[in-house]
UniProtKB/Swiss-Prot annotation:
Coiled coil: none annotated. This is Inner membrane ABC transporter permease protein YnjC. The gene is ynjC. Keywords: Cell inner membrane, Cell membrane, Membrane, Repeat, Transmembrane, Transmembrane helix, Transport. It comes from Escherichia coli (strain K12). Residues 1-8, 84-91, 152-189, 261-284, 340-345, 396-432, 507-511 are cytoplasmic. Pfam families: BPD_transp_1.
Length: 511
């Protein structure tokens, strides 16, 4: 590629990425400006809803984070390494593909008044669950699958497998292996995953509306309600509540770091003292239960759904917005990985490491300033801020694993950088690209706040309809919306899996 053309491409690439990440700036300004006034803080803390909302947020977030971690560790201790672990990992995409709103809707239909399990667990219904315990438990089950998916990549390292086999052969229990080897080895990946889980659990609005306490709601929901009001004082309280969510995230990070440091001091040396093996029944049970929750979710929604009431406009909007946002993100990320900077890319991960509410507020501020609110383009642009980092999460490790010797051989043959990109790197990246496309579509179709705010309510999607119907109405209509919100990502996952299998069959002669 000629040098002027390459520079033009790099400039265009930076400009497009900057447009997507530009809301980070107004988001910061929205939070900083009211935070400088003591009067605004006094008005926030004087609100009678704040203490209970804060307590419900802390309880639900703690249950979600700690519960997801415990479930993941129990499953790892019970199954890894071995064929059962491989089978469980193969079934995880069935749960990962289910959007949070669809999963929460199925839980609501089970535990709400009149649900199948209402008589057995009445306390977990939203009207009675003032502390968000049901919300936290639902998020713990859903996020444990994500945590297992992240850790599965780290646990596949050959040296880690060899060391676990050695400890097992020497008679050390599985919990000793977990404490002495696994946790220190997976700590970096585990820390980033837990940060994403805590940030999302703190700021989740759609799932909290469906399953969380109603009066007062969680801090994220009450902040969202204040931000959407026309009164400037209420908007200021909403901005400060969003800042309070970020302060809570920082407190969780600090507490987790201190607990980690304290735990590290308790790790003894491998001194030959064995401990008796502990029963692995809880981990085995959870390993069976996790994939089944996805199947049960589909079955329950399919039984209750009234297909004659499906909103075709919401279905078309969800499909087109998800596909367009995913295609744009995929094209930008492939070009970014090739011609973008190789270092200092931490800012790309900020949308999944920070609470979503202030970021959406920044998007809305920018859209109002540019007079783009209420447009289809603005909604797709809003989705990209979350679709891109999740797809990058899949693509970047695979890109870094490309064998540099292949690139060197192509360069010795006189191939240009563009030719190497299209004929060497892109074919090698086909399977990760398909996985990233499926994940990106699932993330895009699940967006609630960007769709509602940037679209000004003009573009209904399956997610916005399901959240609206969860407050009251026909269970059949609610189940139908949630079922199609669940089926679309599953169809995309299935299609990408079939394409990957077909490509593997076609390329088997190259092995």
């Amino acid at each position: 590629m000629a040098t002027p053309l390459r520079y033009a491409l790099i400039f265009l690439l930076w400009a497009m990425v900057a447009v997507i990440y530009a809301p980070l700036i107004p988001a910061a300004l929205t939070l900083i400006s009211p935070a400088l006034s003591l009067t605004h803080w006094q008005a926030l803390f004087a609100d009678p809803q704040l203490p209970q909302a804060l307590l419900a947020t802390l309880v639900s977030t703690t249950i979600a984070a700690v519960g997801a971690l415990l479930i993941a560790l129990l499953v790892i201790v019970a199954l890894w390494p071995g064929p059962k672990w491989q089978r469980m990992c193969a079934r995880l995409p069935w749960l990962l593909a289910i959007p949070h709103v669809a999963f929460a809707t199925s839980a609501l239909l089970l535990f709400a008044d009149g649900g199948l399990l209402y008589d057995y667990f009445p306390y977990f219904t939203p009207p009675m669950d003032r502390f968000g315990i049901g919300l936290g438990l639902t998020l713990a089950v859903k996020e444990s699958a994500f945590l297992l998916w992240i850790l599965a990549a780290v646990l596949s390292e050959k040296w880690l497998l060899q060391q676990v086999i050695v400890l097992d052969s020497l008679g050390y229990s599985r919990w000793q292996c977990l404490n002495w080897l696994l946790l220190p080895s997976v700590a970096p990946a585990l820390a980033m995953a837990m940060l994403a889980i805590v940030a999302w659990s703190l700021s989740v609005v759609d799932v909290a509306i469906i399953l969380g306490p109603g009066n007062p709601p969680t801090l994220a929901v009450i902040s969202w309600q204040w931000l959407t009001q026309g009164d400037i004082d209420q908007q200021t309280k909403g901005a400060l509540a969003s800042l309070l969510l970020m302060l809570l995230l920082a407190a969780y990070v600090l507490l987790s770091y201190l607990l980690w440091r304290s735990w590290r001091r308790t790790i003894p040396r491998v001194d030959g003292v064995r401990k008796p093996a502990t029963p692995l029944l809880p981990g085995n049970t959870l390993a069976i239960f996790l994939p089944l929750t996805g199947v049960l979710c589909v079955v329950l929604l399919a039984i209750l759904a009234d297909q004659s009431t499906i909103n075709s406009e919401a279905l078309i909007n969800s499909l087109t917005m998800g596909l367009v946002a995913t295609f744009i993100a995929l094209l930008l990320l492939l070009l970014w990985l090739e011609w973008g900077p190789q270092r200092r890319q931490l800012w790309l991960w900020l949308p999944i490491l920070l609470p979503a509410l202030p970021l959406v507020a920044g998007q809305y501020t920018l859209a109002l300033w540019l007079k783009l609110d209420g447009s289809w383009t603005a909604v797709v642009w809003g989705h990209l801020l979350w679709v891109m980092p999740w797809m990058l999460f899949i693509l970047q490790p695979a890109w870094q694993r490309i064998d540099s010797r292949l690139i060197l051989i192509a360069q010795t043959l006189g191939w240009s950088r563009a030719k190497i990109f299209f004929y060497v790197k892109c074919p090698l990246m086909l399977r990760p690209v398909l996985i990233a496309f499926a994940v990106g579509f699932a993330v895009g179709i699940a967006q609630y706040m960007p769709t509602l705010w940037l679209g000004a309510g003009r573009f209904p999607t399956l997610t916005t309809e399901a959240v609206a119907l969860s407050s009251g109405g026909s269970n059949g209509i609610l189940a139908a919306q949630a079922l199609w919100q669940l089926l679309l990502p599953l169809i995309i996952f299935a299609l990408t899996a079939l394409v990957a299998k077909w490509v593997g069959y076609v390329r088997q002669g190259l092995r």
